[in-house]
From Swiss-Prot:
Main location: cytoplasm
Gene name, Swiss-Prot/TrEMBL: hutU
Name assigned to this protein: Probable urocanate hydratase
Domain of life: Archaea
UniProt-listed Pfam families: Urocanase, Urocanase_C, Urocanase_N
GO CC entries: cytoplasm
The organism of origin for this protein: Halobacterium salinarum (strain ATCC 700922 / JCM 11081 / NRC-1) (Halobacterium halobium)
Annotated segments matching region Disordered: 1-22
Length: 588
């Protein structure tokens, strides 16, 4: 079988991409309007060398998550966007433009479907065969939907998860102060972990097999130091924890080897998790016993042998996490489906202490820490300054804190982000906002979006702002091993909800709507959606914002209300969300 992403690797990078090397900036546009221009800039921002993990191969993050199927497809998308009329919609099928239709001026400019296969065919083997033939692309989540903003995109979610963990497990502590978190994976998503730990005043030891990724996180301020010596890392981390100082160190090494090395030294961290690309055993996860270069060569020459070595390492990795949990560590899976991978391919694991475990004997992060937020429609809301001017984001920082003076956590987050988070590509910001309709009937997200639109209209912001989000959101995902794990009513695998989310946001007039399969957890394991709204200062943009930022978080409320979550039912009552067929059993 050919190597994954072969279609993207067979051609040199596009001359257009080499000319751009990131998104155009400023107030001059090359498209018919700002809605089309926003799509062009967001696509190019995804492939900015400051943003993407491997832009020359169209890979944005997450192993093989691409922004376009091939360089020819990338060029064709740009060509179509430049001539796309306000009343037309471009269709993109797995990173390739396949059609333009006349619709109407408030219809989406772009509709995207990535990586979707019919149920019985939705697995990596079938996907890789089609990918090698150039017929499909892995869009991950925000890679193929042109909404990735670099590591900042996940940083607040990681920060919030760890803050909730600290509240649950160390209620009398100052966050994670004095606690050591052991983790792995410092790619585009996992690279947020060290900074999220130190923002919570803790200490982080992060294993990463690729030295370049550690160095990149240090350069961007997400990780403090690196070492090849695990003993040295443990010594530094222990000293920092005892002093109560935030600290992070990247350890060059395989995740399983590093965790087992900790156990061999009788070192048990307070918290253990990981964000390796375990969702893809062939193109994402690296097996033990190989350098990166040697593993890449094995993948090319003998993919089956690579898979076996990768799965063997994953089983050891999970066994080490469970051994640490048995020894008192707080353990959770951070959404990469490593438990599901090991359960499917290796079954139960045995720890070094001889204990047998089901890989699912430690929880996922959503049921453990995030679901109460989802019940209130709260999730990762992000916005991007198309001007390229950081001052535009700084103005929105002030706006969001002015709008929500009562939200101490939000104010703390904005302060921390301004201090610690470097912009990658177009300046951007992320914060978690929810439904929580106010007296004016606007949700939190809608209130803020309308305010941004006013700032664009009155010239306080130089150029339009794109508002988008992660696919990981309250009502936009079906992922039984992640966002919808352990749903109260057993509807973990029901995929109607993200489909309804995409349909509803299309009806509400979002400027880009996308539907993907497999992001974060691998092909066949999830279905999820994304949307963009372009705030250009117009009355039409304000109306779109009011609609989309009501329907989108509202889907989170009704999805969880339908599953019987009391918090969601309370939110529905408080905010006037209509939930038909409510009965007494639902409110128990």
């Amino acid at each position: 079988m050919d190597t994954p992403s072969a279609a993207a690797e067979t051609s040199e990078p596009s001359a257009q991409w080499q000319a751009y090397r990131g998104a155009p900036t400023g107030t001059d546009i090359e498209c018919e309007g700002w809605r089309q221009e926003a799509a062009l800039r967001m696509l190019n921002n995804n492939l900015d060398p400051e943003v993407a993990e491997d832009p020359e191969n169209l890979v944005v993050y997450g192993g093989t998550g691409q922004a376009a199927r091939s360089w020819d497809a990338y060029d064709a998308i740009l060509d179509e966007l430049r001539t796309l009329a306000d009343a037309e919609t471009l269709l993109v099928q797995s990173g390739k433009p396949v059609g333009v239709f006349e619709t109407h001026e408030r219809a989406p400019s772009v509709l995207i479907a990535n990586s979707n296969l019919v149920g019985n065919w939705a697995d990596w083997e079938q996907f890789h065969e089609l990918e090698a033939e150039g017929k499909i692309m892995y869009g991950q989540m925000t890679a193929g939907s042109w909404a990735y903003i670099g590591t900042q995109g996940i940083i607040q979610g990681t920060f919030e998860t760890l803050a909730e963990l600290a509240r649950d497990h160390y209620p009398d502590n100052d966050g994670l102060r004095g606690k050591i978190v052991a983790t792995a994976g410092l790619g585009g998503m996992g690279g947020a972990q060290p900074l999220a730990v130190t923002m919570n005043h803790g200490v982080c030891i992060a294993a990463e097999v690729d030295e370049a990724r550690i160095d990149r996180r240090i350069e961007t301020g997400y990780c403090m130091e690196r070492t090849d010596d695990l003993g040295e890392a443990i010594e530094r981390a222990t000293a920092a924890a005892e002093a109560g100082d935030p600290y992070s160190v990247g350890v060059h090494g395989n995740a399983a080897d590093v965790l087992e090395g900790m156990l061999d030294r009788d070192f048990v961290p307070d918290v253990v998790t990981d964000q390796t690309s375990a969702h893809d055993e062939l193109a994402g996860y690296y097996p033990s016993g190989y350098t990166v270069a040697d593993a890449d060569e094995l993948r090319d020459e003998d993919p089956d042998a690579y898979r076996e070595a990768s799965m063997d390492t994953m089983a050891r990795h999970v066994a080490a996490v469970l051994a640490m949990q048995d020894a008192g560590a707080v353990a959770f899976e951070y959404g990469n489906n490593i438990r599901g991978q090991v359960a499917a391919h290796r079954g139960d694991v045995t720890t070094t202490a001889g204990e047998s475990h089901d890989p699912f004997d430690f929880p996922g992060f959503v049921p453990a820490y995030i679901r109460p937020l989802f019940c209130r429609g709260k999730g990762p809301f992000r916005w991007v300054a198309l001007s390229g001017n950081p001052a535009d984001i700084h103005r929105t920082d002030r706006a969001v804190t002015e709008l929500f003076p009562e939200k101490d956590d939000l104010h703390r987050w904005i302060d921390l982000a301004q201090e610690h988070v470097q912009f990658q590509g177009l300046p951007s910001r992320v914060c978690w906002l929810g439904y929580c309709a106010a007296d004016d009937d606007l949700t939190e997200r809608a209130r803020f979006a309308v305010r941004i639109n006013e700032l664009v209209d009155n010239g306080e912001i130089e150029a339009p702002i794109v508002v988008t989000r992660d696919h990981l959101d309250a009502g936009s995902v079906a992922s039984p091993n992640r966002e919808t794990e352990a749903m109260r009513d057993g509807t973990d695998a029901v995929a109607d909800w993200p489909i309804l989310n995409a349909l509803l946001n299309t009806a509400a007039g979002a400027d880009i709507v996308s539907v993907h399969n497999g992001g974060g957890v691998g092909i066949g394991n999830s279905l999820h959606t994304n949307n963009h709204v372009v705030l250009d200062g117009s009355d039409a943009a304000a109306e779109t914002a009011r609609r989309v930022f009501t329907t989108d978080p509202g889907m989170g409320v009704i999805r969880h209300a339908d599953a019987g979550y009391a918090d969601a039912l309370v939110e529905a009552d408080a905010s006037g969300v209509t939930v038909p067929m409510r009965d007494a059993e639902r409110e128990q």
